[in-house]
């Protein structure tokens, strides 16, 4: 036990050598492996500094100017700063930066807009949607009536005509637009027309593409949607957290919430706190404010467009090597390898790629005959390698690495050789938050 007056002065390696050793191992891994998971990225040193700051010590239940603890004048300024930066970047009327992550943000939307057993339309998980958009094992699929919409049989893209027919027939109270494994641009204008015809709230989940939207590399849903949710990491390169954007007023107030004295923005805030969460993580909000400052720069706009260029280059290189991609390509930061014509499962290929220093995740493909725990696909993403400074030429080399492993999935010597080549390949690039710390 530390002597009085000495607590808190020792470094991590002095206090806990085991955690320090794990940290060093993770750092080495991230410097020598290709991070191709579409939902991962590298936060900057500034974002990491704010995440590990003394703002982690402050309890701040409530909202700026209306806290349940004293001494929050500074964090009031901090949260207000994050809110204003977020609203400015996306052109939103209202913003809430307190959700602990994307799923809690989505749960708050359910609480603010719906009653239990209301109908919810969303893209099913096997076709690119998210658990919280009405999947059967999630609260959204058990507490609400789920009405799935699907993809066109030939293009594997959202079938907006069938979606419209389903919405007219089922008249869901909420329609989700967004996903975790959908490599194409969403037609927010078409979705808004469909939602209006059905008297449905339209909610966009932009967790994967928020950085692309800020950069102008993907359409902005804010003008078309009642509510927009997101994580604060992934392509926007912030801390692990979430946020919600919304209109101030509810266009369906008289229809669905006539007895409520609160407008849409207020109901969103009340759903986050006190209905679902307690004290916000002020260190995360501080880091989000920093990430939003970074995202407002011209260099971030260049970065966002390069993400898409790199994803397209990787897609073209893999197509040229005979691989099939869901939808035939990509418009955003991700691509889905359909490996149903290959001898092994998506999980098996992902494991072999990882041994070769290529980090991916196995993923379901439309019409997947395999169980979700093994799948027939692999999802690849370009945000992290783009943050390292890689461009189109490097994507061609990455495709060659992937092909070497997948063509010889049981040749461990090949995997070991690719692992060495990948490590050498990565040393030519800096890893943000690691190389500069």
From Swiss-Prot:
Q: Which subcellular locations apply to this protein? A: Cytoplasm
Q: In this UniProt entry, which cysteines form S-S bonds?
A: none
E.C. number: 2.1.2.1
The molecule here is called Serine hydroxymethyltransferase 2
Q: Which residues carry this modification: N6-(pyridoxal phosphate)lysine?
A: 234
**Which keywords does this Swiss-Prot/TrEMBL entry list?**
Amino-acid biosynthesis, Cytoplasm, One-carbon metabolism, Pyridoxal phosphate, Transferase
UniProt KW Repeat keyword: no
Known catalytic reactions: (6R)-5,10-methylene-5,6,7,8-tetrahydrofolate + glycine + H2O = (6S)-5,6,7,8-tetrahydrofolate + L-serine
Query: What is any one of the record's Gene Ontology cellular component terms?
Result: cytoplasm
Q: Its GO biological process terms?
A: glycine biosynthetic process from serine; tetrahydrofolate interconversion
Whom does it interact with, and what assembly results? Homodimer.
Associated pathway? One-carbon metabolism; tetrahydrofolate interconversion; Amino-acid biosynthesis; glycine biosynthesis; glycine from L-serine: step 1/1
Cytoplasm: present as a keyword of the record? yes
Name one molecular function that GO assigns to this entry: glycine hydroxymethyltransferase activity
Concerning Pfam families, the annotation shows:
SHMT
């Amino acid at each position: 036990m530390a002597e009085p007056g000495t607590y808190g002065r020792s470094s991590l390696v002095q206090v806990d050598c085991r955690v320090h050793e794990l940290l060093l191992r993770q750092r080495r891994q991230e410097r020598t492996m290709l991070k191709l998971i579409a939902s991962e990225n590298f936060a900057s040193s500034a974002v990491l500094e704010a995440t590990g700051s003394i703002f982690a010590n402050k309890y701040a239940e409530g909202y700026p100017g209306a806290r349940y603890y004293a001494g929050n004048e500074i964090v009031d300024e901090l949260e207000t700063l994050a809110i204003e930066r977020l609203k400015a970047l996306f052109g939103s009327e209202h913003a809430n930066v307190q959700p602990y992550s994307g799923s809690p943000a989505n749960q708050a939307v359910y609480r603010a807009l719906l009653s239990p057993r209301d109908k919810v339309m969303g893209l099913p998980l096997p076709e690119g949607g998210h658990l919280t958009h009405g999947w059967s094992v999630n609260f959204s699929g058990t507490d609400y009536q789920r009405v799935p919409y699907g993809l066109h049989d030939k293009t594997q893209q959202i079938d907006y005509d069938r979606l419209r027919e389903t919405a007219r027939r089922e008249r869901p109270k909420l329609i989700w637009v967004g996903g975790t494994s959908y490599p194409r641009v969403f037609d927010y204008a078409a979705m808004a027309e469909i939602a209006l015809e059905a008297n449905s709230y339209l909610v966009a989940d932009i967790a994967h593409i928020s950085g692309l939207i800020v950069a102008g590399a993907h359409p902005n849903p804010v003008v078309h949607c009642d509510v927009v949710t997101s994580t604060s990491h992934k392509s926007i390169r912030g801390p692990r957290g979430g946020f919600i954007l919304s209109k101030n007023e509810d266009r369906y107030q008289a229809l669905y919430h006539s007895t409520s004295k609160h407008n849409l923005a207020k109901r969103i805030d009340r759903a986050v706190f006190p209905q679902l969460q307690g004290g916000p993580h002020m260190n995360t909000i501080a880091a989000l404010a920093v990430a939003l400052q970074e995202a407002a720069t011209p260099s971030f706009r260049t970065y966002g467009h390069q993400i898409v260029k790199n994803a397209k280059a990787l897609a073209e290189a893999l197509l040229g090597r005979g691989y099939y991609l869901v939808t035939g390509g990509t418009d955003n930061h991700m691509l889905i390898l359909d490996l149903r014509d290959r001898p092994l499962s998506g999980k098996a290929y992902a494991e072999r790629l990882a041994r070769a220093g290529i980090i991916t995740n196995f993923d379901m493909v439309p019409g997947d005959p395999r169980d979700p725990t093994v799948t027939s696909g692999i999802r690849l993403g370009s945000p992290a390698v783009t943050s390292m400074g890689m461009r189109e030429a490097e994507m061609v080399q990455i495709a060659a690495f992937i092909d070497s492993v997948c063509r010889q999935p049981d040749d461990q010597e090949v995997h070991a050789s690719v692992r060495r080549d990948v490590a050498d390949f990565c040393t030519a690039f800096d890893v943000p938050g690691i190389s500069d710390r």
